[in-house]
């Protein structure tokens, strides 16, 4: 899997005009059929208008008058001629406007498309052409002849670059052909097609865009450079961070400007904001020994 496949690029006469590579990460991956089914169902559901609507008894006009009195007629009691059991009445629990869209993560959509394309590539149902028309004018007749020379002209998906106006105009009127821009390629149209025909520019645009997206997802965030002054705020004998170097075992608290030595009874409960190499370095930075300062306060009392 993930092997790059090389196929021939054909000209309008059906002759080889070069070769094109189908990257393995796009055209040779495992095909996850349940995933493709889920994405296609979501895509078709999102295409539904969802504008269906029925009227309830409160929305149907009329029916404000009670049709007959409550008692004495021998008939069943009725309160309105627009009740659901009446002809012309409202509908109970009828369809209302709603959205059928389903949330589908981008990674799932991309994986389904790659799987569908890989299945087509393994069946040799993907073709690449330089162009569908030889000339500067659109020609549906010539485009149809080119496509017929590749495979059966039935459910053909043509993928073009957006700037390829001549080819676009040449095939858009063919009932057997569905044409898309490279950035419009989707799982449903790939699954629904029997053959996919890329123009050279369309394939380059599709592969280029997908490769850029893949690189953006896989790129690791750059680790910001740590400022030396931030690591050593009080000189070389101080260190700010969670993993102090060996020998930095004096804990300093910048809020109280006190430091704790390992022999301090509060050493284990103290969260170090700054580490010092020695007590002298902490005192030089303006910190005082927490144990001595507390004992001096008790003596003063």
From Swiss-Prot:
Keywords: Ribonucleoprotein, Ribosomal protein, RNA-binding, rRNA-binding. Residues 1-223 are annotated as: Large ribosomal subunit protein uL4. Residues 49-105 are annotated as: Disordered. GO terms for cellular component: ribonucleoprotein complex; ribosome. Pfam families: Ribosomal_L4. InterPro entries: Ribosomal_uL4 (IPR002136), Ribosomal_uL4-like (IPR013005), Ribosomal_uL4_dom_sf (IPR023574). Residues 224-301 are annotated as: Unknown. One of its GO terms (biological process) is translation. It comes from the Bacteria. One of its GO terms (molecular function) is rRNA binding. SUPFAM superfamilies: Ribosomal protein L4. The keyword Ribosomal protein applies. PANTHER family: 50S RIBOSOMAL PROTEIN L4, LARGE RIBOSOMAL SUBUNIT PROTEIN UL4M. HAMAP family: Ribosomal_uL4_B. Part of the 50S ribosomal subunit. One of the primary rRNA binding proteins, this protein initially binds near the 5'-end of the 23S rRNA. It is important during the early stages of 50S assembly. It makes multiple contacts with different domains of the 23S rRNA in the assembled 50S subunit and ribosome. Forms part of the polypeptide exit tunnel. Belongs to the universal ribosomal protein uL4 family. This is Large ribosomal subunit protein uL4. The gene is rplD.
């Amino acid at each position: 899997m993930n092997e790059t496949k090389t196929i021939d690029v054909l000209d309008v006469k059906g002759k080889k005009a070069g070769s094109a590579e189908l990257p393995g990460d796009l055209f040779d991956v495992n095909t996850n059929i349940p995933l493709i089914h889920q994405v296609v169902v979501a895509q078709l559901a999102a295409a539904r208008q969802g504008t269906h609507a029925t009227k309830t008894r409160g929305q149907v006009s009329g029916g404000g008058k009670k049709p007959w009195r409550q008692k004495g007629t021998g008939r069943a009691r009725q309160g309105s001629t627009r009740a659901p059991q009446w002809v012309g009445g409202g509908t109970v629990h009828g369809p209302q406007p709603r959205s059928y869209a389903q949330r589908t993560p981008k990674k799932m959509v991309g994986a389904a498309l790659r799987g569908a394309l890989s299945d087509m590539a393994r069946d040799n149902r993907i073709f690449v052409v330089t162009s569908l028309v030889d000339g500067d004018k659109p020609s549906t007749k010539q485009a149809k002849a080119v496509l017929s020379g590749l495979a059966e002209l039935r459910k053909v998906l043509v993928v073009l670059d957006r700037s390829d106006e001549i080819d676009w105009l040449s095939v858009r009127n063919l009932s057997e052909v569905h044409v898309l821009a490279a950035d419009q390629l989707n799982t449903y149209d790939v699954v629904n097609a029997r053959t996919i025909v890329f123009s050279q520019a369309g394939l380059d645009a599709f592969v280029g865009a997908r490769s850029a997206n893949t690189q953006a997802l896989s790129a690791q965030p750059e680790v910001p450079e740590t400022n030396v002054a931030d690591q050593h705020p009080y000189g070389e004998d101080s260190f700010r961070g969670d993993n102090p170097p060996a020998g930095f075992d004096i804990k300093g608290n910048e809020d109280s400007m006190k430091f704790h030595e390992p022999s301090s009874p509060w050493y284990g409960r103290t969260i170090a904001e700054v580490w010092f190499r020695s007590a002298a370095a902490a005192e030089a930075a303006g910190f005082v020994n927490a144990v001595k300062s507390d004992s001096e306060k008790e003596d003063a009392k």
